[in-house]
Every structure is written in C-alpha cells, then in structure tokens.
UniProtKB/Swiss-Prot annotation:
InterPro entries: DUF987. Pfam families: DUF987. This is Uncharacterized protein YkfH. It comes from Escherichia coli (strain K12). Belongs to the YeeT/YkfH/YpjJ family. It comes from the Bacteria.
Length: 73
C-alpha cells in the first residue's frame, strides 16, 4: 500500500460511511517541508485499512508528521 494525499483519502472516507480515521502508527516522523515527501512511499498492508495519508502536526518541539489511516474496523 502507498501513502496517498489527504484529499484522496478523504474522498475514500466519504465513499464508505462505516469507515473511521485512526493513527496508522504511534511514531512521529520529522517534517520535511511538504507532504509530497511522504506521498507515494510504501507502507505495510494491514487488513481493514483502506488508505494511509500523512498529516502535519505540531507540538512544543516543532512540526512533525503523523501517518493517519482510513479503516473499516
């Protein structure tokens, strides 16, 4: 499975009314200035996960990337 854009992920989310948004993993990744640095990268397949996208977040230590998933679970 590849990381897709948040826009495409939200389209998938709206197409499946029973789907929910969860964190794909608990890790934080260094932010590299644009979501384009993450789009297209491979991530392991997990049953029930429809899509994975990268989201920029910020805490007191600065910006970081969080991988979010659209799931059917």
């Amino acid at each position: 499975m590849k990381i897709i854009s948040k826009r495409r992920a939200m389209t998938i989310y709206r197409q499946h009314p029973e789907s929910r948004i969860f964190r794909y993993c608990t890790g934080k990744y260094q932010w590299h200035g644009s979501v384009c640095h993450y789009t297209g990268r491979d991530v392991p397949d997990i049953a029930g996960v429809l899509a994975v996208y990268a989201e920029r977040r910020q805490d007191r230590n600065g910006p970081y990337t969080c991988l979010m998933s659209i799931t059917l679970n």
